Amino acid sequence: MLQQQTQSPGWRVLNRDVIKYIAMTAMLLNHIANIFLVPGTLWYEVLVDIGYFTAITMCYFLVEGFRYTHSRKQYALRLFGFGVVSQVPFSMAFAQNGILEFQDFNMMFTLFLCFCILLCIETIRNRFLRGVLIVLLIFGSLFCDWALLAPVFTLLFRWFGQDQKRLRFSFALSAALFGWLNYTSSVWLYPTAQCLLMACGSMAGIAASGFVILYLYNGQRAARGKKFSHWFFYLFYPVHLLVLGVIRVMG
């Protein structure tokens, strides 16, 4: 996806699947913290911040996958289908009371909306209609995990993702925006110095994603186990949520 990926091959040692496995691990740590740990504590903040690596990484690979997939229809159906499959485990894992509690739609639905935004940009020629549909899709993300932010990440990667310098700007802007949102949402709950520290910490996962993709990603898929990795990434999401949800309920 990056025009300059071949200029420094010695540094680019991570393929797409390895980065996705890292993202899945980071997401698991984030979810463990959100479900089982007390907000504001050291380990909560550390694990949650590590997990912020995942969403922006998935948005980047969504844009890349959109460009190179053999079937955009099948891609969209997979995202929507696994969104449906994941909703009960998601509602179970993050319920505040009882076994199930609906709070918002899961990240698979968010990625589906982001995919639809990309489809609108690519296929709808009428600028007014295209703009209206994109705004509606962004509005729809308000009811999903990573509301507004995931569409913003996706649009930035769509516009700037094929140029190294602009991609650096996209990650920097995303990190700054996320840090600012975290600061403004916590400023009434914690002392100012702690809010600033937490905001800086929240930017670390996005910054790490930017470093990995900009400087370590070689633009390739794993040479072996492509089919296994492909389905593992989809299945891991609902399965790990179900396991965490069962542990929460039993605990």
What are these regions (language model features)?
Residues 1-251:
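Alpha-helical transmembrane segments and their immediate juxtamembrane cytosolic regions
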